[in-house]
């Protein structure tokens, strides 16, 4: 997945393909597992950001490239979508601000403009760490080549179940 430029389509529209070199060539990541319950790839590791926050990445599923300084290019698969969504959220705890991360990862839309308007200048990694919130898994609700609906699952000790689900499209 690569950011899409589809500003006229509104907040709930599906992303349009981009014509950037990143999307046309280098982001063509080989898909080996299209299951909604994929096997963990042998190259899955954890990227470390500020204050020791970590999130999963895979050299084979994504991110496989850097585009404009951002981790990009994920397999068009359920696991690729989950890793892309997690990377988009956690990138703000790496070398980019929350606004920079949102600007890169969210498709151009009314929703993007609203998100950027309320984005903090800098995210607080200590707040995330102290809450005990960590990536724990994902659930695929719907998947096609061009659109995915998923729920990222986080451990969250203060919740009634110990987990928190974040739905995304």
Where are these regions (language model features)?
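Structured, amphipathic secondary-structure segments that form assembly/contact surfaces
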Residues: 97-169
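Small-side-chain structural scaffolding
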Residues: 11-13, 81-85, 148
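Juxtamembrane and targeting peptides
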Residues: 2-76
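Core segments of small alpha/beta cavity-forming domains
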Residues: 48-120
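Detector for Asparagine
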Residues: 5-6, 28, 91, 103, ...
